[in-house]
């Protein structure tokens, strides 16, 4: 079973959930999760919790405890907040390059699913009639302690956008498309660790939208430098085979560029300098 995770404390999450139920034929089941109704459509369930999802480490275990199955993949339907209040549709995997400021553990990473995130970008971009930004975000926040692949898909960046009906529809349709197609998409994409650039990963986003690269974890410039151990830890937390390390050269620190280059060589991965 595939899981779409939502929370009552997030207006964007509730917006997306309502659109999923209205537009895609999800039906309420007799099951509950964290005291909330579970909705089902084919092999996809919508689960709802009562607190911020970024703190929900071991969610996969909790699903198994409460519902008796281990999910194949978890899509977190969420809001994105930023001071700039940039209207945006974003996707990313969770993890902490350093200290855990917002959920998860220090220097720990969730399992990335690059094909699902790439398909999310492509579908959001195709459906985006709002004129908003569509982009990756760098790896950040929790949860990190999950043993099944997961990704966040978000409406940003202020309440005005979180409750926007069309944004809710776009994300709902994107999630359904991605969960139906990510396994088929795998063979067409080149999976990469992304390094460099700002939080919204402009170069990685462009490469994913225009070419065959599919990014998992993304290390932005503001989180650099990291140790060799941390970079290897991130590389080991991909649910799909990593084929390349991509570096936004100008958007990276010198020591991080060199570390990426030497690791690519050592691990037999393609090194892509942009």
UniProtKB/Swiss-Prot annotation:
Enzyme class: hydrolase
A biological-process GO annotation: D-amino acid catabolic process
Names of the cofactor(s): Zn(2+)
Cofactor note: Binds 2 Zn(2+) ions per subunit.
Keyword flag Nucleotidyltransferase: no
Catalysed reactions listed for this entry: a D-aminoacyl-tRNA + H2O = a tRNA + a D-alpha-amino acid + H(+); glycyl-tRNA(Ala) + H2O = tRNA(Ala) + glycine + H(+)
Residues spanning the signal sequence: none
Lineage: superkingdom: Archaea
Enzyme Commission code: 3.1.1.96
Keyword terms of this UniProt record: Hydrolase, Metal-binding, Zinc
Database matches in InterPro entries: Deacylase_DtdA_archaea, DtdA
Disulfide bond in keyword set: no
MF GO annotations: D-aminoacyl-tRNA deacylase activity; zinc ion binding
Pfam families hit by this protein: tRNA_deacylase
Functional summary from the UniProt entry: D-aminoacyl-tRNA deacylase with broad substrate specificity. By recycling D-aminoacyl-tRNA to D-amino acids and free tRNA molecules, this enzyme counteracts the toxicity associated with the formation of D-aminoacyl-tRNA entities in vivo.
Record-linked HAMAP family: Deacylase_DtdA (MF_00562)
NCBIfam families: PRK03995.1-6
Quaternary data: Monomer.
Family stated for the protein in its record: Belongs to the DtdA deacylase family.
Protein name: D-aminoacyl-tRNA deacylase
Organism of origin: Pyrococcus horikoshii (strain ATCC 700860 / DSM 12428 / JCM 9974 / NBRC 100139 / OT-3)
């Amino acid at each position: 079973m595939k899981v779409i995770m939502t929370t009552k404390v997030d207006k964007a999450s509730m917006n997306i959930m309502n659109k999923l139920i209205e537009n895609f034929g999800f039906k309420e089941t007799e099951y509950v999760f964290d005291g909330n109704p579970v909705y089902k459509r084919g092999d996809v369930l919508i689960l709802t919790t009562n607190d911020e999802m970024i703190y929900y480490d071991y969610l996969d275990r909790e699903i198994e405890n409460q519902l008796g199955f281990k999910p194949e993949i978890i899509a977190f339907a969420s809001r994105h907040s930023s001071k700039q209040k940039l209207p945006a549709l974003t996707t990313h995997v969770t993890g902490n390059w350093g200290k855990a400021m917002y959920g998860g553990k220090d220097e720990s990473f969730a399992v990335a699913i690059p094909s699902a995130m790439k398909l999310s970008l492509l579908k959001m971009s195709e459906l985006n009639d709002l004129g908003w930004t569509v982009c990756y975000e760098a790896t950040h926040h929790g949860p990190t302690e999950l043993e099944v692949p997961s990704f966040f898909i978000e409406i940003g960046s202020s309440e005005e956008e979180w409750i926007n009906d069309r944004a809710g529809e776009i994300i709902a349709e994107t999630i359904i498309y991605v969960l139906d197609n990510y396994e088929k998409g795998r063979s067409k994409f080149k999976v990469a660790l992304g390094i460099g650039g700002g939080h919204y990963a402009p170069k990685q986003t462009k490469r994913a939208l225009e070419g065959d690269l599919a990014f998992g974890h993304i290390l932005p410039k503001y989180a650099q430098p990291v140790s060799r151990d941390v970079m290897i830890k991130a590389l080991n937390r991909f649910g799909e085979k990593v084929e390349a390390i991509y570096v936004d050269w100008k958007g990276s620190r010198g020591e991080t560029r060199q570390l990426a280059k030497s690791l690519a060589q050592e691990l037999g991965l393609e090194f892509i300098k942009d």
